[in-house]
């Protein structure tokens, strides 16, 4: 349930992981138990209930599930409460023993503790869920990071953007090609493509952030593009996916100069891009983004890094909304256009806002 409630805010869900991952994150984040039921009331046992429990405790300190259920029926309490009562009763017993005679209690303690732990773990079912969820959340968040670009961003996979990007790019280009091309307009389709790239992509996302720093270097860009793939979710995935490491350079150049399409010069390859910019959209099979491209086109023709052959249409959602800035800083702001709404306004810090 939590995930559903929360998902809307986290656009990441595009990747899918997001839902659960976010969920998990939440508990650790700050509202530990709220999504669950509020605190359980303190269970008060009546004298008759205590008598039944104590009688069983006298028989065995570690009643099995069947015994616990039987007693639970007798005293009309959930089995979980019975389990917890036994756990606490054993602890009390142990404490008394320790205070009474430290030496004797130790062996007992040793014996009981392992068992106790096991029963404890079961009982923890009731208590620990929060803890569990948080731990799960952290782990899941980590895993999700891999899956979600957004998460990844958080995770800061950026570490070796280049490597990741490069690796991604190659496969990406190929894989993306086919699917992406299919849906010019459909970001979703692209999404699907990216997903395969998903894990790497996220990495790329991170890289992207890193790349942003390194934006100047064309190479970094390629990576970032790779990340783009992961972005695929929101953006016309194709663009991201397309950013094969290869062409990225071209795009990059263009990107940073939307206004100076030919600034591509930085990337020789981009030169092609420069020319095609306008047309490429059409050509690229991956035109998926083309729908977007169009919008983008207007803004930045060169964007279509048509040259890139990868159908990364600049349209790919890289709007260089701030041309001047973009030009100034090689770091291109990839503002993913409308669909993507990712405005990398801050080139330096790309926020991967997953929508």
Swiss-Prot record:
It comes from the Eukaryota. PROSITE patterns: HOMEOBOX_1, HOMEOBOX_2. Residues 38-97 bind DNA. GO terms for biological process: anterior/posterior pattern specification; diencephalon morphogenesis; forebrain development; inner ear morphogenesis; metencephalon development; midbrain development; positive regulation of transcription by RNA polymerase II; regulation of transcription by RNA polymerase II. Residues 115-144 have a biased composition (Low complexity). Brain: restricted regions of the developing rostral brain including the presumptive cerebral cortex and olfactory bulbs; expressed in the developing olfactory, auricolar and ocular systems, including the covering of the optic nerve. Residues 92-144, 257-306 are annotated as: Disordered. Residues 94-103 have a biased composition (Polar residues). InterPro entries: HD (IPR001356), Homeobox_CS (IPR017970), Homeodomain-like_sf (IPR009057), Otx1_TF (IPR003026), Otx_TF (IPR003025), Otx_TF_C (IPR013851). Transmembrane segments: none annotated. Pfam families: Homeodomain, TF_Otx. There is a cross-link at residue 345 (Glycyl lysine isopeptide (Lys-Gly) (interchain with G-Cter in SUMO2)). GO terms for cellular component: nucleus. GO terms for molecular function: DNA-binding transcription activator activity, RNA polymerase II-specific; DNA-binding transcription factor activity, RNA polymerase II-specific; RNA polymerase II cis-regulatory region sequence-specific DNA binding; sequence-specific double-stranded DNA binding. It is found in: Nucleus. Residues 274-284, 291-303 have a biased composition (Basic residues). Keywords: Developmental protein, DNA-binding, Homeobox, Isopeptide bond, Nucleus, Ubl conjugation. Probably plays a role in the development of the brain and the sense organs. Can bind to the BCD target sequence (BTS): 5'-TCTAATCCC-3'. May play a role in the specification or differentiation of neurons in the deep layers of the cerebral cortex, and also in cerebellar regionalization during early development. Belongs to the paired homeobox family. Bicoid subfamily. This is Homeobox protein OTX1.
């Amino acid at each position: 349930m939590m995930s559903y409630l929360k998902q809307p805010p986290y656009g990441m869900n595009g990747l899918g992981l997001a839902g659960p991952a976010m969920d998990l994150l939440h508990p650790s984040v700050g509202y530990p138990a709220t999504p669950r039921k509020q605190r359980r009331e303190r269970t008060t046992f009546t004298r008759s209930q205590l008598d039944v429990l104590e009688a069983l405790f006298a028989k065995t300190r570690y009643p099995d599930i069947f015994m616990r259920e039987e007693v639970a029926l007798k005293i009309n309490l959930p089995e979980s409460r019975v389990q917890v009562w036994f756990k606490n009763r054993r602890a009390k017993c142990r404490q008394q023993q320790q205070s009474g005679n430290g030496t004797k209690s130790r062996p007992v303690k040793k014996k009981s503790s392992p068992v106790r732990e096991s029963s404890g773990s079961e009982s923890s079912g009731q208590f620990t869920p929060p803890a569990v969820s948080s731990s799960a959340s952290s782990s899941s968040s980590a895993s999700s990071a891999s899956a979600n670009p957004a998460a990844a961003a958080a995770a800061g996979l950026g570490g070796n953007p280049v490597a990741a990007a490069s690796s991604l790019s190659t496969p990406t280009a190929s894989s993306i090609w086919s699917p992406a091309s299919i849906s010019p307009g459909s970001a979703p389709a692209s999404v699907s493509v990216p997903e395969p790239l998903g894990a790497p992509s996220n990495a790329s996302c991170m890289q992207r952030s890193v790349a942003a720093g390194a934006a100047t270097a064309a190479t970094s860009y390629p990576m970032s593009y790779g990340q783009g793939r992961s972005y695929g979710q929101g953006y016309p995935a194709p663009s991201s996916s397309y950013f094969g490491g290869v062409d990225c350079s071209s795009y990059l150049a263009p990107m940073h100069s939307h206004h100076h399409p030919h600034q591509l010069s930085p990337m020789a390859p981009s030169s092609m891009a420069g020319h095609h910019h306008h047309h490429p959209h059409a050509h690229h099979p991956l035109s998926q983004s083309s729908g977007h491209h169009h919008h983008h086109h207007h803004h930045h023709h060169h964007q279509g890094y048509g040259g890139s052959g990868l159908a990364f249409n600049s349209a790919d959602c890289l709007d260089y909304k701030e041309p001047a800035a973009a030009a100034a800083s090689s770091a291109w702001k990839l503002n993913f256009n409308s669909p993507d709404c990712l405005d990398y306004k801050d080139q330096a810090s790309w926020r991967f806002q997953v929508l």
